[in-house]
Amino acid sequence: MYIIADWRRTHYSEQVIPEMDGQEVILMGWVHSIRALGKLAFIILRDREGLIQMVVPKQKVDEETFELAKKLGKEDVITIRGKVVANEKAPKGFEVIPMEIRILNKADAPLPLDPSEKVPAEIDTRLDRRFLDIRRPKIQAIFKIRSEMLKSIRKTFSEEGFIEVNTPKLVASATEGGTELFPISYFEKEAFLGQSPQLYKQMMMAGGFDKVFEIAQIFRAEEHNTRRHLNEAISIDTEMSFVNEKDAMAMLEKVVHNCYTDIEYNRPSEIETLELNFEIPEKTFPKVTYSEAVDVAVSKGVEIEWGEDLSRAAEKAIGDEMGGLYFITEWPTQTRPFYTLPDENDNKICKAFDLMYKELEISSGAQRIHKYDSLVQNIAKRGMNPDSFETYLEAFRYGMPPHAGWGLGADRFTMILTNQENIRECVLFPRDRQRLTP
């Protein structure tokens, strides 16, 4: 007992099939459920890939194995060496009869949370015991799809010639001149947790990298307490040289479309576990201008003036009209960050876009200002001091190419892919205004 010794897993649960009749296997995992019925015991073993049934008939196993099986408790960690026996009446067309069972660790009882999903629990209770919560097949399915999404994105960027980079998360000032920053003590100075890699991405365009991406944490000291906001999030950021905002949107369409196709192909069992109506979007998404979006909101009774950022009610009205994935383009310049390039024919609007899914914004991007003088003027016009951006601005004095890019929220994108209503379902250990543990 409690010793793995020389045993090593030969198969995960989903790899065992009826055609393996008579074959010996070694399985490892947790006791999902146990039933002892006289001279027969049924054990459902759960591992990362699913559930598998083991039958322990007293007349076919030695007495020690049978008695050990009866003493197992829920969530005990075990390994078994047994034989696959084809059986048409069994759930998957086969059973495994253990020849030997080893208990690697016992679980305390009662459990503070039921991983079998038979006893429902509120999300805060589940997050407090996240290590148990993520044993649930549906929760594991969410994070397997998330993993597949990130894998797909890296694959697409690699195929398109992007370089993966890592930018600092300890910064001296705000990226966008805002106040949504977490201050920290940095030796004799004050520093902040990075809210965006934006300025660093642009500096790399001056360095001649042409196309870069980063997948990393961002931190925002927003006091929102909603189902779609977190204070620590994963952002998928990219920047490209010698392109405009339309090229950036096309790249975003390709990244998102490829995610859907890769998930459908590689994660069918997780799609089934979550009972998703998984539809692959078209390769290009519908586009509406900000002005058109405002008209839609007003037509549905939402009070909004041109030039205002979209309210929650406006987003809901527009999302109900559009449905699915779509872009909102040609935003009012005053609503976007200082580095966003105004339209050459009408400086009241700029070359910015948001990618929406129904009422949820999942990505924001734009073509950037690449001329030094224009950027300095725009910073000053916004009431900020250009001296605060000295190292950033210097990159624009020595040959900055035209460039554009975007940031895609990995957590919100996971919400869409897995049809979750709360972003906390899509983050292993979420950080919001109230939650700093576990």
Swiss-Prot record:
Q: How is the cofactor bound?
A: Binds 3 Mg(2+) cations per subunit. The strongest magnesium site (Mg1) is bound to the beta- and gamma-phosphates of ATP and four water molecules complete its coordination sphere.
Tell me where in or outside the cell this protein is found: Cytoplasm
PROSITE patterns, from UniProt? AA_TRNA_LIGASE_II
- Tell me the residue numbers annotated for binding Mg(2+) 3: 361
Residue positions annotated to bind L-aspartate are 176, 220, 364, 368
Query: Which residues does this entry assign to the site Important for tRNA non-discrimination?
Result: 91
Catalytic reaction equation(s): tRNA(Asx) + L-aspartate + ATP = L-aspartyl-tRNA(Asx) + AMP + diphosphate
- Keyword check for DNA damage: no
The record ties this protein, via PANTHER family, to: ASPARTATE--TRNA LIGASE, CYTOPLASMIC, ASPARTYL-TRNA SYNTHETASE
By sequence similarity, the record places it as follows: Belongs to the class-II aminoacyl-tRNA synthetase family. Type 2 subfamily.
Its subunit composition reads:
Homodimer.
Q: Which NCBIfam families match?
A: aspS_nondisc, PRK05159.1
| Name of this chain's protein | Aspartate--tRNA(Asp/Asn) ligase
Primary gene name: aspS
